[in-house]
Amino acid sequence: MSRKQLALFEPTLVVQALKEAVKKLNPQAQWRNPVMFIVWIGSLLTTFISIAMASGAMPGNALFSAAISAWLWVTVLFANFAEALAEGRSKAQANSLKGVKKTAFARKLREPKYGAAADKVPADQLRKGDIVLVEAGDIIPCDGEVIEGGASVDESAITGESAPVIRESGGDFASVTGGTRILSDWLVIECSVNPGETFLDRMIAMVEGAQRRKTPNEIALTILLIALTIVFLLATATLWPFSAWGGNAVSVTVLVALLVCLIPTTIGGLLSAIGVAGMSRMLGANVIATSGRAVEAAGDVDVLLLDKTGTITLGNRQASEFIPAQGVDEKTLADAAQLASLADETPEGRSIVILAKQRFNLRERDVQSLHATFVPFTAQSRMSGINIDNRMIRKGSVDAIRRHVEANGGHFPADVDQKVDQVARQGATPLVVVEGSRVLGVIALKDIVKGGIKERFAQLRKMGIKTVMITGDNRLTAAAIAAEAGVDDFLAEATPEAKLALIRQYQAEGRLVAMTGDGTNDAPALAQADVAVAMNSGTQAAKEAGNMVDLDSNPTKLIEVVHIGKQMLMTRGSLTTFSIANDVAKYFAIIPAAFAATYPQLNALNIMRLHSPDSAILSAVIFNALIIVFLIPLALKGASYKPLTASAMLRRNLWIYGLGGLLVPFIGIKVIDLLLTVCGLV
């Protein structure tokens, strides 16, 4: 689930943003945005000029200079407001997280075991390596790993999901997060971080923007904007001697107004807001990004590594068919398969019991009443089963059962090999059942491909993104599911080493790779990937290796993460196109007005037929300020984004924002000029 979305212009946030906008007028804050710093200097200069004119120290129209100065200050304030509003929305989201942090005491154990003597210490004094005991009703005081016990944990304060989760020692569910609450039982936890370094602390710092640094693309765009500003600054500086040589020197106020209207103030004023809003939108999807760089990288990704289970398929494989070996009755196979699954509580095991009941009316039997011994599945044996009387029944992967049969002096039948291949080609997973050394047949486990996933992959392909399915299945099963789902490639029988090698291979080809993971064995690959989304339900090692954490622990979220990243890049590109395009329209307003007296031929450029030179210049400056406010919703919400090829996206961008950037200023400046004239303000 996602967190409650804030209204775009929440009244309390707007008021706070206005206050922050005024505070940001401090030159120490302004110089970080070079384009708007030039506007700030121009505002200060024209303010001094208008005061000097009003006092008679300088000749000129004091009222006109004051109006220009006022609107230049408004331009700076609007740019500050856009950034402050974006930051305010992020801080509001962070405040909801701060409520989770509670000053509490923890029971620090003197020995790493349940029942050991404990000391009551403030939670904020716990250090990495300390052992604590938490029981039902307690708030977990630190991030850590469960070393003993198991408990139901309410993580809704972090994830927004109301359903409790089980945390227990061992495996991939041993990681706990400080600030979550124990609902039942108890846990002995080893703290994995020092104070101020918890997941919650990092989340708050990231969301508040305290650690926000400019991304590479943002830096490159800033350099471009600075270069354009320097060019226009030099060009404007040379205009004064030209006009003076013509016998009618242009005033400094007009030159400052010209400079401000020519430099890319629109994108300059909104650039920071776009970056902050991108991270905020990611949080709206319940994904915490460690930096803007991670969000930006998501927009540039061109290879997605997707786990099959839970991402491409529903993840709950169900027994669909019993396929007996030659000379074996199907009911005999079903009976043995059901016996081997009686104590198997996995979805697959339960489905085998149910299928045998449905097909042959075989009732469930109690393992204890049968005086049987259940053999659990392990990663080493890759099979499970039951020992009952003199019968030894096992079910498991083909390779595991083959080794088991051969170890017991038996022979794996060729016809079963054929049946295994047949099941795998159909996209199902084959489990082989054996009694003693005699192979009884194959169980087909069918996993269902998610509806609509093939269409989503087609959209990603259209965008130039390659999809690769990662699965532990054999190559035949993987190939069948890959074909059904519509992915571009697959990695079968995947191991952590194989994932890491595949990522490095794609990166060596100059591609950017995104993946998800939740286990400690995923950590090396997550650390190597350009965009690494760790599941919040995963281990501490996985979360530390990734550069994003999905609070919903939903592997499918990776596609949404890429969408948000591309939307941020699209928004930045769209507003840059619009900003540069609307500068062209402003040339036709200001240049004829500023120099018509010196060079009458320039009147031919006054295609908007503006009322007077003063109204033309003032209208352009007013429009230049107002357009920032009108574009704030676009900067915060993001430009509309559709899965298109790069060339189609460029054409769409140029038509909407390029042509729009040309037309909107012509209309806006003309309307403002008419209003100023009608109201008698010029």
Curated annotation (Swiss-Prot):
Mg(2+) binds at residues 518, 522. The keyword Cell wall biogenesis/degradation does not apply. InterPro entries: ATPase_P-typ_cyto_dom_N (IPR023299), ATPase_P-typ_P_site (IPR018303), ATPase_P-typ_TM_dom_sf (IPR023298), ATPase_P-typ_transduc_dom_A_sf (IPR008250), HAD-like_sf (IPR036412), HAD_sf (IPR023214), P-type_ATPase_bsu_IA (IPR006391), P_typ_ATPase (IPR001757). It catalyses: K(+)(out) + ATP + H2O = K(+)(in) + ADP + phosphate + H(+). Keywords: ATP-binding, Cell inner membrane, Cell membrane, Ion transport, Magnesium, Membrane, Metal-binding, Nucleotide-binding, Phosphoprotein, Potassium, Potassium transport, Translocase, Transmembrane, Transmembrane helix, Transport. Its main location: membrane. The active site is at residue 307. One of its GO terms (molecular function) is ATP binding. Its EC number is 7.2.2.6. Belongs to the cation transport ATPase (P-type) (TC 3.A.3) family. Type IA subfamily. It is found in: Cell inner membrane. Disulfide bonds: none annotated. This is Potassium-transporting ATPase ATP-binding subunit. The chain crosses the membrane at residues 34-54, 62-82, 219-239, 254-274, 588-608, 616-636, 656-676. It comes from the Bacteria. ATP binds at residues 344, 348, 377-384, 395. It is a multi-pass membrane protein. The system is composed of three essential subunits: KdpA, KdpB and KdpC. One of its GO terms (cellular component) is plasma membrane. Part of the high-affinity ATP-driven potassium transport (or Kdp) system, which catalyzes the hydrolysis of ATP coupled with the electrogenic transport of potassium into the cytoplasm. This subunit is responsible for energy coupling to the transport system and for the release of the potassium ions to the cytoplasm.
